Amino acid sequence: MARMKRLAGMALAAGLVIGGLAAVGTVPAAAAPATCSGSKTLNGTLADGSTYLIQCPAGAWNGTLFLYSHGYVVPGEANPAQDGTDPVTEGWLLDNGYAIAGSSYAITGWAVKSALTDQVATVNVFDQSFGRPSHTIAWGVSLGGMITAGLIQDYPSLFSAALPLCGVLSGGVATWNTALDGAFAFQQLIDPSVQVVHITDPTGNLTSGEEAVTAAQATPQGRARIALVAALDDTPGWFNPTSPEPASTDYATQEQNQFDWDTQVTFPFVLDFRAQLEAVAGGNPSWNTGVNYAADLAKSADLAEVKALYKAAGLSLSKDLQTLNSAKRISANPLAVTYLAQNIAYNGEISVPTLTVHTIGDGLVVPENEQAYRAVVDRDGRGALLQQLFVSRAGHCEFSPAEIVTAMQVLLNRMSTGHWNVPSPADLNKDAAELGPSFNIISVNNAVVPATPAYADFSPTRYLRPFDLFPFPIL
């Protein structure tokens, strides 16, 4: 149960459960467009069963709609419509004249396909109810950051700008390939009984993996191998959002943090929730045929840690890498790859100003996702439209409302001036601090705690398993 509590905390950080939402009703009868003001709230049900939520400001609407895409919801869990990350950020938007909206998506789990159409349908409901906005800004967190980037790629005419936060911006194929690499190394070196694809008993599979990794953590050899598993995912050695980043050579603390990422966050996705992905994709969409794990480790941000822990444990790193490279490989179902590429991988064809934000200590959606997205956008010649910001904090989507609002102001300034005027990290932090204590908070383990603004200079390393649609999909 501890892991599910931690996932609930991650959902909280990703803006899933910070505040209550209005009850969901039915689709309103068609009528002439009304004025989006007076704190009007509109909720209802779309044709596929997804629900939507729209809120209007108390005063005059300024003509801009913020369309929010929420993050991953554990399969089978409650899935209400959401129109923002948290009450503080939502309140700032409404107080400043913006309308806000979002949907629940028709399914839980890997819901990208339904999310894209449900979000567009929600915009259509807004248009029919209040008239078409002058500007619609797509934004979202985690899987919702991925959906945000998908919306501006697939429906460019609907949007004026985008703000993907902690987004899965390497795309679905690369993300699940990377997840397979870590799981495969875990299977080969620590728990041969675990299933990494075609999972028949997700709950039992996860339990087996958790028991094995906990046993491994008790020995130097096991800890070295856990670090290798983490390195093939580029999992950072920083876990607690309220703790400072470990020193660059504090490998013991880094490995403990990677163990915490595995047991409290990552393993449920790779050993349990993958089964839901394969169900919607129609098969296994991931492969490691042709992967050279020694070469990938050489490019990993965690290389020095792995070498040091293997040496301390008296283990042969080259022997374990040879075990991985000589093991029987896993092939993908081509139709499932096509499904996941459609839902979604990126071609770099952005046509609106796009600002991404990522914590540097994110072990679920690693910051290297930003490098993958930057690479494909630059390769398509659209790099001038993209800016990327980083927050020096551990955790997945562990942004304060102040940091989110500050990013929104950067994006809004780009929309109004036609050029990027991105302040330095110090100035961004000053702007965030000036919003006051009620904005400078984060949620940690279901508790709200103060947070100092933490924008910082950062350059992520290369994403280890790239896959994109530039210039054409090659499946």
Which residue ranges define each predicted feature?
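Repetitive helical segments and hydrophobic/amphipathic motifs
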Residues: A14-G15
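Bacterial N-terminal signal peptides that target proteins for export
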Residues: M1-A11
